[in-house]
Amino acid sequence: MVWREQLENFSPEEHWTQQEEQQSFTLPVLMFHYIQDIPATTKDQRGYRLSYAPQKLDKLLDFFEEHAITPLTFRDLKAIVEGRQTLPKRAVILSFDDGHLDHYTNAFPVLRKHHAKAVFFVIAGKPDQDPKFATRDQIRELASAGFEIGSHSVSHSNLASLGSKRLREEVFESKARIEKEIGLPVLSFCYPAGRYDARVLKLVKEGYLFARTTQP
């Protein structure tokens, strides 16, 4: 996992070297939250730490193009494992957490400009309920444009702290809602705040092929 502050000096050669030496998928996953240009002097220091400017994303994708780095999705990894697709020599996954409105307004145009693939992990209970998040129509547009939409639960709760019934709703209801909206299977899940326990792992394995966390 590569965090915002690490992107300034991003050099994932170690991942690719390991990938070439082993018969396994070892590739960097770049995690983004807000795609917005926010000054370092802002009072919202958490927002600043979790933000990445659109122009920096543009330059990062320029760098990828110059160095033949290919953004993939988890859907691509499934195709690679099944032998329907070839793994590029240099590959990364771009993942965007939460389904913020700026993913649609700021990240989407930059990704489309570079023909770059990405995965958007959506909090299923937010579209059309919170103006800070992308709408259902916008999520559908992202899916129609070829981006992968994954689940980030229904409410972004700490799943490890929930009772069994609520936990199942967060894991499976989020998948069902998103699939109903986009008309495609949801293959990937992102643990809210990276938190999970054995119960969470078991349920996610039942409903998804891939899961992403910030915790090893």
Language-model region placement:
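Intrinsically disordered, low-complexity boundary segments flanking structured domains
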Residues: E13-Q19, Q138, A176, R212-P216
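A generic local structural motif
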Residues: W16, K78-E82, A134-D137
